[in-house]
Design a protein with these regions (language model features):
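Conserved ABC ATPase "signature" region
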Residues: 5-25, 133-137
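Interfacial catalytic loop of ABC nucleotide-binding domains
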Residues: 25-30, 148
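Conserved ABC ATPase signature
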Residues: 29-34, 38
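A short, proline-enriched helix->beta-strand linker immediately N-terminal to the Walker B motif
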Residues: 49-53
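P-loop NTP-binding/switch modules centered on Walker-like glycine-rich loops
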Residues: 56, 60, 64, 68-148
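Charged, flexible cofactor/metal-binding loops and thiol motifs
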Residues: 118-211
Length: 211
């Protein structure tokens, strides 16, 4: 254990580590007196206090404006390097994934449907899960002509108590075949570093099936 004075000094030190200005003052304040970005930094300091080998960050940038989000992501990257901490990001923000992740697991209906290095996921690679493909084409791009609508994935995620037979994504998949409705695919290796849960993981093959 430590004395109250030692604990106070440790708190101030941790707040300083996450780049909070005037940590001695902030340590005495209540949460409602801090901005959203400051509260997020305090949470990160609390999580790092015990020097974990793994930090789980569940939607760490939700409800933050883009400037504060960039600051928080830079902070987490810096802390990862300084402390040697691995970070497990849980997020729906593809921009955060592209900026922060080394490896990505894409989940749908509680299942991992694809695992790959981030650099593979964000390039026009040979293989992918149709859900991953749908996510990627929904990203706004600077070169998209004015007036062109973004693509979206039809339908909605099924209720956990009423999941479809076969592939869980089949009812929403434009590449769906009869086999997909009857059998559930396994997560299989399509390359040395990529796994996909789909009977038709090769993009060229499944697009040919549409013709």
């Amino acid at each position: 254990g430590m004395s109250k004075e030692e604990a106070r000094k440790k708190v101030v030190e941790m707040l300083a580590d996450v780049k909070i200005p005037n940590p001695e003052v902030v340590a005495k304040q209540y949460p409602h007196q801090l901005s959203g970005g400051m509260r997020q930094r305090v949470m990160i300091a609390m999580a790092l206090a015990c020097k974990p080998k793994l930090l789980i960050a569940d939607e760490p940038t939700t409800a933050l404006d883009v400037t504060i989000q960039a600051q928080i992501l830079k902070l987490m990257n810096d802390l990862k390097r300084e402390h040697g901490t691995s970070i497990l990001f849980i997020t729906h923000d593809l921009g955060v994934i592209a900026q922060m992740a080394d490896d990505v697991a894409v989940m749908y209906c509680g299942q991992v449907v694809e695992m790959a290095p981030a650099k593979t996921l964000f390039t026009d690679c040979e293989f992918s899960h149709p859900y991953t493909e749908g996510l990627m084409v929904s990203i706004p791009r600077l070169d998209t002509p004015a007036g062109v609508r973004l693509e979206s994935i039809p339908g909605s995620v099924p209720h956990p108590l009423n999941l479809p037979k076969g592939c869980k994504f089949a009812p929403r998949c434009k590449y769906c075949q009869q086999r997909c409705l009857e059998e559930e695919p396994e997560l299989v290796n399509v390359t040395e570093e990529q796994q996909v849960r789909c009977f038709y993981p090769r993009k060229e093959e499944r697009r040919a099936n549409l013709k």
